[in-house]
């Protein structure tokens, strides 16, 4: 049963081949038996899941349901879930019980989707390896000596190990697409503003976006149908009709113009990864797409600009965790300043502290113009590069990550080396564009991701391009060795 995709689960539930309760119990049993190996979940909501599954079965019996009714998924532990711990993988929020649901959680609840639990992640979504979690690192099901990517590593590992058929995730600089690449999954980050951020604990508010990790593009389309919505509670959410993302999945790719940026194939890209991406380009040519060389000349500035803007926003957002209102509070503070200092020192991990310090420095008097203001100007130039490119092409294609999954500890002592893992994904966030990663082969028995970037609100086109690639290949059907 755990081999089924979301689309197959939907069909089976409609045909009464199995019940939501049976599927949910099956996944809960697998999590209990296998997740000690992967550490993909922080909280398993067994009782809640079975209650939701029973309610979904009643709705299914009545026949008046949404497409996803009865399907179980996992939620990244960055999304607030009423009555359930929402920790952001931090000691700071270890005991925080959210009083309300994030909008996307509420959307899925209304659709009858079952919550299996909350998945592990890098602390406050800051990381590319899922090594910064207060609850311990997550292991990649393809090779347990290697990282699953981050920050949505728990969501990726859970889906790759078949401990959930799909999971919600978030992406600030690549945190959906990079784990998708390293774990052999489909991961989509929608256009900024397409999906509500209300109830998603903020890292960098102008970059954060909720999205999906699944096995196939078809599954991602089904899940995005219910995830995307206009939400007046999120002032950055755009009031725009949500299309049926499954409607054009089978549309032929004849006439699709795919741009390949020369800047994505330079120094630092694993040659074997490059070869697989080039092979994927040939697949697209065989499907009727035309390939065009494009230039994104400010690509080399994306990482430095991001690591000024994101820490600056994180410094502001995380200032709310002060030991007064909620979150970790130190014992016996001498005065208010001691309360602030010790609560934050004890509650935040090393990487979070590093980014807060960098961000505070960039925003400080005398440095704002030299760093933050300049980074925002670079951001505008990066966005303009994409705008110019999309005058000539429909989709931009390249590698998702410069190399396959790396071993634990191999980059932890060099923050810059870790930051460069997101070199191909960050620009998409800076521009606010939709991005998607799909598997395109294996290097040294580890998955490699192919990234597709679309114009604003072109999620349907990206999903169509991804689905057609998956109809022509079987990379998305490959399972990590040893998975039961």
From Swiss-Prot:
This protein's GO CC annotations: glutamyl-tRNA(Gln) amidotransferase complex
Chain coiled-coil ranges: none
Job description of the protein: Allows the formation of correctly charged Gln-tRNA(Gln) through the transamidation of misacylated Glu-tRNA(Gln) in organisms which lack glutaminyl-tRNA synthetase. The reaction takes place in the presence of glutamine and ATP through an activated gamma-phospho-Glu-tRNA(Gln).
Domain of life, source organism: Bacteria
GO molecular function: ATP binding; glutaminyl-tRNA synthase (glutamine-hydrolyzing) activity
The organism of origin for this protein: Cellvibrio japonicus (strain Ueda107) (Pseudomonas fluorescens subsp. cellulosa)
Gene Ontology process terms (BP): translation
Catalysis performed (reactions): L-glutamyl-tRNA(Gln) + L-glutamine + ATP + H2O = L-glutaminyl-tRNA(Gln) + L-glutamate + ADP + phosphate + H(+)
InterPro entries: Amidase, Amidase_CS, Amidase_dom, AS_sf, GatA
Quaternary structure note: Heterotrimer of A, B and C subunits.
Cysteine disulfide links: none
Entry keyword set: ATP-binding, Ligase, Nucleotide-binding, Protein biosynthesis
HAMAP family referenced in this protein's UniProt entry, alphabetically: GatA
Gene: gatA
Pfam families cross-referenced by the UniProt entry: Amidase (PF01425)
Record-stated family: Belongs to the amidase family. GatA subfamily.
E.C. designation(s): 6.3.5.7
Protein name as catalogued: Glutamyl-tRNA(Gln) amidotransferase subunit A
Active site: 76, 151, 175
